[in-house]
């Protein structure tokens, strides 16, 4: 069939159907979303969970959610801005921080469900291929699928660092090693040591040493926060190892203290008077005026 020009006449506009709002905004891939949320028809009212990973300029968000008619329900969430509590105060958007955030959301949700003792995951981050095994007695491991949104799923992407952290934390997520750092597509071989370096921030440490030797001004500019906090390249591995231990020991989220609502809120405009208050103000104004007149008469 040849090229047919679209005639935008009355019939065209009468039948025109707009796409979903988030498709028009370019925020949601509904082709992928449909396959992530549609559950098997023989699993009645069984949620299909997703590990949602999103990156911003200064933060990493990891959420476990499932879909409902009224909208997605967030079961648990973790953010990289929580990592300073566990000892990681810089580099909150790199691969190592993504791994820590994924580990945090996994341990937090398993603790919430009471499965943290049953499924401890991989305690030492070594980059090896790991899949959680179901326990002989008790419930199965928590299963979810990775939701990357509109991100490119290239080999070594940070989104897979968050997924690896969640898997090592005890989640059952279907995956392979083909997208992890250290996988060679030509040789079809996986280097766990390369992946381990990324998990523990050793690739950042190597770049710090290299940049400091080649261009000190660029080093001072790019790693100013590291310098301010006194963190050198040799400290990174121990910093991330301690963070993993701290996350496992206490994944619970700190609740913000409730605001004291007993105090009256500050007003930026005059309070509206009631009818009785307005009448009383008129009476007071009349009395003051009469008193002033009497005072003038006495003087005269």
Curated annotation (Swiss-Prot):
| A Pfam family annotated for this UniProt entry | Ribosomal_L5e
Indicate, by first and last residue, each region the UniProt record lists as having compositional bias (Basic and acidic residues): 246-267
Molecular-function GO terms, alphabetical = 5S rRNA binding; structural constituent of ribosome
Per the record, which residues fall in region Disordered? Answer: 246-276
Keyword vocabulary terms for this entry: Cytoplasm, Nucleus, Ribonucleoprotein, Ribosomal protein, RNA-binding, rRNA-binding
Q: List the disulfide bonds.
A: none
InterPro entries of this UniProt entry? Rbsml_uL18_euk (IPR005485), Ribosomal_uL18_C_euk (IPR025607)
Where does this polypeptide localize? Cytoplasm; Nucleus
- Which SUPFAM superfamilies does the protein's record reference? Translational machinery components (SSF53137)
Q: Which GO terms describe its cellular component?
A: cytosolic large ribosomal subunit; nucleus
Gene Ontology process terms (BP) = ribosomal large subunit assembly; translation
Q: Supply the CDD domains for this chain.
A: Ribosomal_L18_L5e (cd00432)
State whether it acts alone or in a complex, and with which partners, per the record.
Component of the large ribosomal subunit (LSU).
Instruction: Sum up the protein's function in the record's words.
Output: Component of the ribosome, a large ribonucleoprotein complex responsible for the synthesis of proteins in the cell. The small ribosomal subunit (SSU) binds messenger RNAs (mRNAs) and translates the encoded message by selecting cognate aminoacyl-transfer RNA (tRNA) molecules. The large subunit (LSU) contains the ribosomal catalytic site termed the peptidyl transferase center (PTC), which catalyzes the formation of peptide bonds, thereby polymerizing the amino acids delivered by tRNAs into a polypeptide chain.
Q: Which family does it belong to?
A: Belongs to the universal ribosomal protein uL18 family.
Its protein name is Large ribosomal subunit protein uL18
Gene name, per UniProt, is RpL5
């Amino acid at each position: 069939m040849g090229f047919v020009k679209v005639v935008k006449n009355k019939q065209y506009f009468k039948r025109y159907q707009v796409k979903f709002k988030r498709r028009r905004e370019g925020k949601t891939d509904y082709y992928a979303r449909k396959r992530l949320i549609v559950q098997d028809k023989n699993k009645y009212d069984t949620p299909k969970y997703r590990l949602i990973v999103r990156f911003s300029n200064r933060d990493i968000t990891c959420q476990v959610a499932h879909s409902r008619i009224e909208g997605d329900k967030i079961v648990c969430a973790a953010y990289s801005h929580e990592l300073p509590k566990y000892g990681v105060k810089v580099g909150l958007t790199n691969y190592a921080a993504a791994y820590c955030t994924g580990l945090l959301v996994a341990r937090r949700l398993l603790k919430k469900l009471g499965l943290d003792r049953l499924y401890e995951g991989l305690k030492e981050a070594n980059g090896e291929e790991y899949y959680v095994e179901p326990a002989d007695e008790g419930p199965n491991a928590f299963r979810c699928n990775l939701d990357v949104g509109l991100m490119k799923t290239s080999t070594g992407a940070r989104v897979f660092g968050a997924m690896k952290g969640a898997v090592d934390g005890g989640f059952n997520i279907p995956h392979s090693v083909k997208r992890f750092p250290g996988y060679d597509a030509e040789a079809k071989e996986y280097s766990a040591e390369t992946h381990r370096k990324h998990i523990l921030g050793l690739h950042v440490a190597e770049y710090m040493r290299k940049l400091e030797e080649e261009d000190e001004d660029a080093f001072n500019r790019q790693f100013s926060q590291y310098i301010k906090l006194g963190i050198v390249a040799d400290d990174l591995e121990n910093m991330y190892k301690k963070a993993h231990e701290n996350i496992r020991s206490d994944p619970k989220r700190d609740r913000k203290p409730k605001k004291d609502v007993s105090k009256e809120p500050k007003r930026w405009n005059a309070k509206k008077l009631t009818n009785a208050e307005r009448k009383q103000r008129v009476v007071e104004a009349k009395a003051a005026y009469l008193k002033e007149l009497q005072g003038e008469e006495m003087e005269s």
